[in-house]
């Protein structure tokens, strides 16, 4: 689609992706980390470049598509480079499952955990990812966030929260989400209604503006639920 023009900060953005890389993905300097995403996408910015490199880890970058010349390519790369943390999107997991459901068994690699990002992952796809790709051992870190947020907002955390197929888990530390309906009424747990996810507090990774269009930035992201347009207090 058309680029949004999200303008991120420098220090705050780096601090947030470094923090989530360390505390959510548990990346350490000795790890070989592979985020199998497009480097031109926010996931590539945050979790191919800035996050793992800020942790002094080795970050794998590859060219081409995962299933060419054959669907065993990702697992060969993982085996050859001793990748121990894997990160990809449900769309890619579905593609790999369809193209070569038994391919992971052919290769000797070991992931301690695997991240999923970008969209919901169906429980049956999640189970294949865990059983076949993760060999029944790797923890799945199921995340929710978007371009505007800079890094993870919700996620299961390795060893701290139980995995649930198809669920991205609770808010990460420092993030306080709430669900509002169209009239700014809060929808509590069990409300049985759809609403809009809002974050009640600022955080270092949140984007600063839309490039060249601050009015659209305010109208799109803040005006709907703003209690006092003249206030300078973020709580309003």
How would you describe each model-predicted region?
Residues 1, 38, 118, 145, ...:
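Active-site glycine-centered loops adjacent to acidic/histidine catalytic or metal-binding residues
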Residues 1-15:
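Conserved AMP-binding A3 loop
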Residues 11-32, 42-84, 99-101:
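Conserved AMP-binding/adenylation subdomain of ANL enzymes
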Residues 50, 57, 84-88, 97-165, ...:
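Gly/Ser/Thr-rich phosphate-binding loop
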Residues 117, 154-156, 169, 189-192, ...:
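Active-site glycine/GP-rich loop and adjacent strand/helix microenvironment
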Residues 162-171, 188, 224-236:
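Short Gly/Pro-enriched turn/cap motifs at secondary-structure boundaries
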Residues 178-201, 206:
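Conserved beta-loop-beta connector loops within the AMP-binding
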Residues 198-236:
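Conserved ATP-binding/catalytic segment of the ANL
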């Amino acid at each position: 689609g058309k680029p949004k023009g999200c303008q991120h900060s420098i220090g705050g953005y780096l601090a947030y992706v470094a923090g989530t890389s360390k505390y959510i993905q548990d990346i350490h300097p000795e790890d070989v980390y592979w985020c199998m995403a497009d480097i031109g996408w926010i996931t590539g910015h945050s979790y191919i470049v800035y996050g793992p490199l800020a942790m002094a880890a080795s970050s794998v970058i590859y060219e081409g598509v995962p299933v060419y010349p054959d669907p065993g390519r990702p697992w060969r790369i993982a085996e050859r480079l001793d990748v121990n943390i894997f990160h990809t999107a449900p769309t890619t997991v579905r593609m790999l499952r369809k193209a070569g459901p038994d391919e992971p068994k052919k290769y000797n690699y070991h992931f301690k955990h695997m991240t999923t990002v970008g969209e919901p992952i169906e429980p049956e796809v999640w189970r294949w990812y865990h059983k076949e790709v993760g060999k029944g051992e790797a923890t799945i870190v199921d995340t929710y966030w978007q371009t505007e947020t800079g890094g993870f907002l919700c996620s299961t955390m390795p060893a701290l929260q139980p995995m649930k197929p198809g669920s991205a888990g609770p808010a990460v530390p420092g993030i306080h989400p709430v669900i509002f309906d169209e009239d700014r009424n809060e929808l509590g747990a069990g409300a049985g209604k759809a609403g809009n996810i809002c974050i009640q507090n600022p955080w270092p990774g949140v984007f600063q503006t839309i490039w060249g269009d601050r009015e659209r930035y305010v109208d799109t992201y803040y005006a709907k639920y703003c209690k006092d347009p003249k206030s300078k207090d973020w709580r309003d």
